[in-house]
Structure formats: structure tokens, C-alpha cells
């Protein structure tokens, strides 16, 4: 019995931590083609979302169950171990992506004793209905926006006229932003995502701060 417990725990750990070696697709040569020799991994993104959740809940005294939020954030990307990091621009519908993610997460969780809790957290996160899931979702999106600005400030983003292979530019929404005067990669990230945070002041303020300030500290 004890051996089975250890086996289940180690299987989950060894599978889930493969995210350390999965690169965030949005930064690859088919998307923003970040010029840094080392590109952010999915695990680093997950870590960033957790730090962001701790920081914002602390400074703004946000009424959420932080432990629940952190579990959601840790769990929500582990499907990418099996299916990779699928972006909104990768020719797959949101419904298809969600189904693939759910199947992958269930497979990775396996027979952990907390299987039911973890699957429930995954579903709650995806529905974006509870205060914890909305907060976690906003942390997930904002962390990516911040990373885009970090790359911008470090000089790792290419100019907008060097994006001939970027699938993001096939989006009519992105083309409209270019027509309206977007000058940098982060301009597009900012305009694309800012509406997500409408009415959620800590996130509105955080995104604006990142936009207006250099992230090099």
C-alpha cells in the first residue's frame, strides 16, 4: 500500500515537472520569435502567476481563498506536458483546446488521492465564474502581459516590420491594432488583453503600471 502511494506521488511529480522543459509557445519562432538565447518555460510562467497572486492579494487585500487560487494556478497548465502550449492563434477552437486539456490533466493526475479535488479545481478555473477562478485567470493573463513587456524592455522583441512569420498577425483583431497605430509588440499585447481586466482594478492598475514603467529593476 505504501509503495503504491509513493508510486502515484512520484508519477505525478515526474510528469508535472516536465513543464520545466516546455517552452512557452508564444515566444517561439512561429509567434513572437524572442531573440533571447533562453526563452521562458511553462513552469516559469506558472511560478510567475503564483508570485503575482501572492503579491496582488497582499497589497490589495483581495477577498479570495489564496491557497485555492495557488492550487488552481499550479494545476492549470500541466496539460501542456502532453499536448504542448496551444495559443489562441494556433488553428484550434477554444472548445477543442479545452477538451484536449481536460483529457491530458486527468491522465497526468492519474490515481492521486486528491484526484477529485484537482479535477474540480481545473473545471472551476476554466469556467471563470467564482471569485477565485476569476482572480487566478487574471493572474494567468497578466503574467504573460508582464513577460511581454519584460522582453520588450530587454530588447528581445523584434520590430513589428520583422514579423513575417508571426501567426499572430493573421488575426483581424491584431491587424486592426496595427492600423490604429500599434508601434511595438507590447502595444499589441496591451491592447489585445486590456479588456479582460475591465472592472478588476488591481489588474487594470498593474497592467497600466507595467505599460508606463521600465521593468528593469
Label for each model-derived stretch:
Residues 1-217:
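Alpha-helical, largely C-terminal catalytic domains
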